[in-house]
Amino acid sequence: MTSRKPLGRYRRIVIKIGSALLVDRKAGLKKAWLDAMCADIAGLKARGIDVLVVSSGAIALGRSVLDLPSGALKLEESQAAAAVGQIALARAWSESLSRDEIVAGQILLTLGDTEERRRYLNARATINQLLKIGAVPIINENDTVATSEIRYGDNDRLAARVATMTGADLLILLSDIDGLYTAPPHLDPNATFLETISEITPEIEAMAGGAASELSRGGMRTKIDAGKIATTSGCAMIIASGKTESPLSAIENGARSSWFAPSGTPVTARKTWIAGQLQPAGELHVDEGAVTALGAGKSLLPAGLRSVSGLFSRGDTVAIIGPAGREIARGLVSYDAEDARRIAGRKSAEIEAILGYAGRAAMVHRDDMVMTAQIRPKSERQKKDASYA
């Protein structure tokens, strides 16, 4: 069972706030709600807890300021709304936090800032320096320059990447959803609320719902994706409603929320970065023998490789997919896609004869790999796989 610790037991908390909580479509910024949230944050900081905020709302706030019509926005309209909204959003956070003599620092990230190793380290250093001097980083995706091809797509996953980047031990996702149900409760009156989730299994993933509101891009699907990123890196996660004022106090006082347990296996900073990669360059599909070997902490050898998909270069991050079609690990691949296909299913001793050079024995070395799913015994895996056939 997942341990529900008081928030004061955590040392570094990332809080993601959805657009609909901060911005009213007609009235604009919900200042009273923001002031109450900042008072909650001040309470955590008074207990010595580092707090980071991933704040949605720039596009929604800019849309309100510009009085744009309802409905989907074109890319250039969204970017214009973000340009206006980012200024207003940063000002609002700064003013509300200053009531408790807390300084806010704005950070706008693009996908490359967490997916490219050098930029990742630089962004992490900047955030850590802000925390060191007692400021609260207010983080958002830089929607003025991001396009569909180079964006996170939602702030749930961005928040998870920030949590893993900064070594946070708790991620709180606040939105208009109070947690995870076995089915959408507005569609199924028999839907059961899940208070604790010890592992994100295929069954849990199947419970994730779909689309979001006009003011936001997130949904339960993105929250489960965020949970996989965070918990794999040893960070617990909470999904809770932010509709009430002082939602952090409400969580501490027992308000309904879903708690996700972190992985029991600590990972290095480098493996944390690998695990959280949002866009693997390709996929390596492996057999049952390889799954068993990886579960035992061994490297992935070419012999266990059934097929290769995608275009990638040596050193890129790839997803490792088991026979049931589920991702089980991620790692830095030792070969480019073309050579990986040529040696798939072959013994390591044959590599030089096939490729004409002596490459690494492992397709993905265990030091460059992190498990993203728990590997059960083979008999149990086969039984579960049959239920999805």
From Swiss-Prot:
The organism's superkingdom is given as Bacteria
This entry carries the following GO cellular component terms, namely: cytosol
What's in the keyword line of the UniProt record? Amino-acid biosynthesis, ATP-binding, Cytoplasm, Kinase, Nucleotide-binding, Proline biosynthesis, Transferase
Is ATP-binding a UniProt keyword of this protein?
yes
Which part of the chain is the PUA domain?
281-358
Q: In which pathway does it act?
A: Amino-acid biosynthesis; L-proline biosynthesis; L-glutamate 5-semialdehyde from L-glutamate: step 1/2
Provide a Gene Ontology MF annotation, just one: glutamate 5-kinase activity
Instruction: List ligand-binding residues for ATP.
Output: 16, 175-176
The Gene Ontology biological process terms listed for this entry are:
L-proline biosynthetic process
Instruction: Write out the residues that bind substrate.
Output: 56, 143, 155
User: Any idea of its EC number?
Assistant: 2.7.2.11
Q: Which reactions appear under catalytic activity for this entry?
A: L-glutamate + ATP = L-glutamyl 5-phosphate + ADP
EC class name: transferase
Identify the SUPFAM superfamilies for this entry: Carbamate kinase-like (SSF53633), PUA domain-like (SSF88697)
User: Where in the cell is the protein located?
Assistant: Cytoplasm
Enumerate the InterPro entries for this protein. Answer: AceGlu_kinase-like_sf (IPR036393), Asp/Glu/Uridylate_kinase (IPR001048), G5K_ProB (IPR041739), Glu/AcGlu_kinase (IPR001057), Glu_5kinase (IPR011529), Glu_5kinase/COase_Synthase (IPR005715), Glutamate_5-kinase_CS (IPR019797), PUA (IPR002478)
The UniProt family comment states: Belongs to the glutamate 5-kinase family.
What job does the chain carry out?
Answer: Catalyzes the transfer of a phosphate group to glutamate to form L-glutamate 5-phosphate.
Name of the protein this chain belongs to: Glutamate 5-kinase
User: Which organism encodes this protein?
Assistant: Rhizobium etli (strain ATCC 51251 / DSM 11541 / JCM 21823 / NBRC 15573 / CFN 42)
